[in-house]
């Protein structure tokens, strides 16, 4: 849920008149170790393989926003400040990135698996002990529409235990209208034709079940699900396997997320067979308190 939330933040700040930059590690991208500017706000300078899938998607979907990658985010951040003069910088996936000072820490909690088993890697999925939630300035619960009210209350109780009286923003991932891959690649977002009735899904995401649930929430019926590891860079063999699986299943289309779609652009596809399901993050509860608190803290820091 990080990428949709970063998109949400960048658009809101941009609308408020800020010149926004995003710093990301660029995990598994060719520029991860060296550092690079993916977009200067006016032009996209790298492809998905060079930038990494998530930073490239951010650059593609956020015109006017600066996007840069590099393991050493302090160094690439200094370069961005010197060359491009942003007024606000969003550090994507940076709660543990100690070398870079920040004014506001936001922790995202996936409602479908909020606290794993309470254990850190490798015995669990947490990167830090739950007690470190006390460092957060605000909490954001994503995919809250995919759990029950009782589960939401339990999440709120756990967060309040670690740090009460900080903003708690509840959000949902809402699917938009699916579009043919060729249209999506050209920047079109409205599918005019009737959609096929039989799909299979394909994804290389950290939480594939969540994407598959979102496909179902969009009213689409998937007859099979193909999963690859998170951040996997697709090959032509992957495409052949997916298209062959779909045809054997009697499906008329393969549906992917936008994060997957950016990695398909260098491959040969039966383009009429492929569809993209865009999603957007929508705030449902706590939005005003969240922004007012952050703006107050930010002004104090300035």
Where in this protein do the model-derived segments appear?
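Short, polar loop motifs at secondary-structure junctions
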Residues: 25-27, 93-95, 208, 258-262
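Phosphate/Mg2+-binding loops and adjacent switch elements
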Residues: 26-163, 170
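Short, flexible loop segments at boundaries between secondary-structure elements
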Residues: 174-178, 228-232, 271-302
């Amino acid at each position: 849920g990080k990428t949709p939330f970063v998109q949400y933040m960048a658009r809101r700040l941009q609308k408020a008149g800020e010149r926004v930059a995003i710093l990301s590690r660029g995990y598994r991208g060719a520029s991860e170790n060296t550092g690079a500017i993916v977009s200067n706000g006016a032009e996209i300078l790298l492809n998905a393989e060079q930038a990494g899938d998530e930073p490239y998607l951010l650059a593609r979907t956020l015109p006017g926003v600066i996007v840069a990658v590099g393991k050493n985010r302090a160094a690439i951040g200094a370069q961005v400040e010197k060359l491009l003069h942003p007024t606000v910088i969003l550090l994507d996936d940076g709660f543990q990135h100690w070398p870079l000072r920040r004014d506001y820490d936001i922790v995202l909690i996936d409602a479908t698996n909020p606290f794993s088993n309470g254990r850190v890697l490798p015995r669990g999925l947490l990167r830090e002990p739950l007690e470190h939630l006390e460092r957060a300035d605000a909490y954001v619960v994503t995919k809250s529409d995919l759990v029950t009210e009782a589960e939401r209350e339990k999440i709120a109780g756990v967060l309040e235990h670690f740090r009460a009286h900080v903003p708690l923003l509840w959000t949902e991932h809402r699917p938009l209208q699916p579009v043919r891959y060729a249209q999506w690649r050209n920047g079109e977002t409205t599918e005019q034709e009737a959609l096929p009735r039989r799909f299979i899904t394909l994804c290389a995401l950290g939480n594939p079940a969540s994407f598959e649930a979102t496909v179902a929430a969009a009213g689409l019926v998937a007859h099979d699900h193909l999963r690859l590891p998170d951040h996997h860079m697709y090959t032509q063999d992957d495409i052949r396997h997916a298209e062959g699986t779909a045809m054997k299943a009697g499906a008329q289309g393969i549906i992917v997320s936008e994060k997957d779609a950016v990695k398909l652009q260098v491959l040969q596809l039966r383009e009429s067979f492929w569809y993209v399901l865009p999603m957007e993050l929508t705030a449902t509860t706590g939005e005003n308190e969240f922004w007012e608190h952050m703006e107050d803290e930010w002004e104090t820091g300035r």
